[in-house]
């Protein structure tokens, strides 16, 4: 028969083990929760910047409407890139994350010595590493070895585009003048599992991105300076002073669009909301002047879904795009509309092309957004 005093002794011996197991379980659970709340891994690799964009292209391809787009007619340079690497942006790119570096005179921008905006990118997709490396060696002026990684220095229009193959499915690109920027990406790729990683601006505002968003952007808004940068020139009409914009898109039976515009104070947020409401009123006014589509149920549902709210120091804009409206937009696109491919990925510099890249004397939208990769021609 076991002595009565044996049970307390057994408990005392087991208690430290139980406590240790509970602590380990709690730590594992905390890491899982934190990783679930953290930005996508591709975005966490990006350097500190003034704006971020992430797109899950693998998900976007599941939309039935995209299968109805006209076929892409490739320009010779892009076709050569595809032939040499086997990589097709419109087919093989699964995720894309971009960091936008504003010039220093844009309120302490992160572009370093560059007087123009610069970009850093992470591409995730189905790469043939052997063919890709062979291509990069061919177009590089030099190759830097850094912590067992090769960084390919590609001269392009008076600047250097740096490319590093991080893994079998990930590639980093940057045209930032400081080579330490892409070296930092390489360093972060070695400790990617950390849910605490990523640029400060991204970490701070990612919590405002709705759950399950397949595309989002987080941008510092500098209205006065952005007026000189094509693609952002109209923002000064909406923002009275600097702000932060959190834009997102997610698909739940319809495409839900949301913009959270964080102002410096409640008064500025109210002004933003009032100006945005004026734009929405213009859209509603245009609803009756678009011909036969004016009575279309899907189009009407979209216009009716446009809403503007004001809450504290933020203005909130929301809209819901029905699947039918998406299909109508795609079906009604002109024959010379841009095709889904490298040119539709803003800021991309991974592929060589005949036109300038982002930040080169103007807007990324006006020039080939992929300096280094030829864009495909318009669909026919």
Where are these regions (language model features)?
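Short, conserved charged micro-motifs
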Residues: 62-64, 128-134, 266-273
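Sec/Tat-exported extracytoplasmic proteins
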Residues: 57, 61, 85, 104, ...
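N-terminal Lys/Arg-rich, disordered targeting/topogenic segments
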Residues: 1-12
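Hydrophobic membrane-insertion alpha-helices, especially the h-region
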Residues: 16-32
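An internal, short helix-loop-strand segment that often contains or flanks glycine-aspartate motifs
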Residues: 64, 68-93, 143-253, 269, ...
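N-terminal mature-domain "stem" immediately C-terminal to a signal peptide or N-terminal signal-anchor/transmembrane
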Residues: 32-71, 78, 374-379
């Amino acid at each position: 028969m076991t002595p009565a005093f044996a049970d307390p002794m057994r408990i005392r011996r087991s208690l430290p083990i139980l406590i240790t197991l509970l602590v380990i379980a709690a730590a594992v659970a905390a890491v899982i929760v934190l990783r679930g709340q953290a930005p996508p891994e591709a975005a966490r690799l990006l350097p500190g910047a003034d704006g971020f964009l992430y797109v899950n292209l693998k998900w976007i391809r599941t939309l039935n409407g995209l299968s109805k787009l006209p076929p892409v007619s490739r320009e010779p340079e892009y076709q050569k890139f595809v032939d040499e690497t086997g990589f097709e942006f419109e087919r093989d790119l699964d995720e894309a994350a971009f960091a936008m570096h504003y010039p220093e005179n844009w309120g302490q921008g992160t572009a370093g010595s560059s007087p123009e905006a610069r970009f850093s990118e992470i591409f995730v997709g189905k790469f043939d590493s052997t063919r890709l490396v062979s291509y990069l060696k061919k177009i590089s002026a030099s190759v830097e070895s850094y912590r067992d990684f090769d960084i390919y220095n590609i001269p392009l229009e008076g600047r250097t585009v740096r490319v590093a193959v991080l893994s079998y499915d990930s590639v980093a690109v940057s045209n930032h003048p400081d080579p330490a920027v892409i070296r930092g990406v390489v360093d972060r790729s070695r400790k990617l599992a950390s849910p605490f990683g990523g640029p400060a601006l991204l970490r701070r505002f990612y919590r405002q991105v709705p759950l399950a968003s397949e595309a989002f952007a987080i941008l510092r808004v500098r209205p006065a300076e952005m007026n000189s940068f094509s693609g952002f020139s109209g923002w000064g009409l909406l923002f009275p002073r600097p702000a932060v914009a959190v834009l997102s898109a997610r698909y739940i039976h319809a495409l839900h669009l949301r913009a959270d515009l964080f102002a410096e104070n409640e008064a500025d947020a109210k002004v933003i909301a009032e100006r945005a409401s004026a734009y929405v009123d213009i859209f509603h006014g245009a609803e009756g002047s678009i011909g036969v589509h004016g009575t279309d149920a899907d189009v009407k549902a979209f216009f009716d879904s446009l809403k503007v709210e004001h809450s504290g120091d933020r203005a909130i804009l929301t809209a819901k795009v029905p699947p039918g409206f998406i299909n109508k937009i795609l079906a009604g696109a002109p024959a010379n509309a841009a095709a889904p491919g490298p040119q539709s990925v803003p800021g991309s510099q991974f592929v060589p092309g005949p036109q300038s890249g982002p930040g080169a004397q103007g807007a990324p939208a006006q020039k080939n957004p992929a300096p280094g990769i030829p864009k495909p021609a318009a669909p026919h």
